[in-house]
Amino acid sequence: VICDINQAGCDANVEEMKKMGIEAAGYAANLTDPDAVKELVNKIVEKYGRIDVLVNNAGISQKVTVADMTLDDIKRIFSVNMFGLFLITQAVCEVMKKQKYGRIVHLSSVSGKRGGGVFGGAHYSASKAAVLGFSKNLAREVSQYGITTNCVCPGLINTEIWKSMPKEQADAVIAGIPMGRPGETQEVANAIVFLASKEASYITGEEIDINGGSHMD
């Protein structure tokens, strides 16, 4: 089951998955709207009876300096990256608690750990750092219900944004990556699949860096 603010985007992804032989469904919802989130979760539970895995992948960014940033800019970034994540996680956790089982994986970022350096401004980095703290605290609250909550922190990934970068800027970013290349989306997906599996049953409150060595801690 996938969710997007745009139904056409959902439908396109669902069709792509169906061609691969995957049973899929897509729902349009604004994750920053509490009522829309509740309705979404209710629809999914009505149809499938349970929710085993939640992957929080919704996010937005903006390249702007602190000097040029506005309070509205900060609110907009946090509204999706943190507040929307909170709303869907809160709603899904109630379902998972009743099941005594759940896997939650949040998409944070290397920017949330080292403070920018790839895309986005300080407000983006701050929102992704907030996700890390939220996940750790949540782990202490829900572990007793058989629910794990972890983060993945991608660095530079081979997406359309990366491909659109000017060569000079791209070369400068690559120079800071020991592996000398951007990551692939499949490499991020592999980590998410592991954290969402039963094999990761004793891992919670953790963060996995996927950045080719550009940040190590």
Regions found by a protein language model. Give the residues of each.
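The beta1-alpha1 cofactor-binding region of Rossmann-like NAD(H)/NADP(H)-dependent oxidoreductases
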Residues: 7-8, 28-39, 71, 186-187
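Substrate-binding pocket helix/loop in short-chain dehydrogenase/reductase
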Residues: 65-66, 73-78, 162, 173
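Active-site helix of classical SDR
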Residues: 89, 127, 135
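Residue(s) in the substrate-gating loop at a strand-loop-helix junction
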Residues: 109
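C-terminal helical subdomain
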Residues: 144, 151, 172-203, 210-212
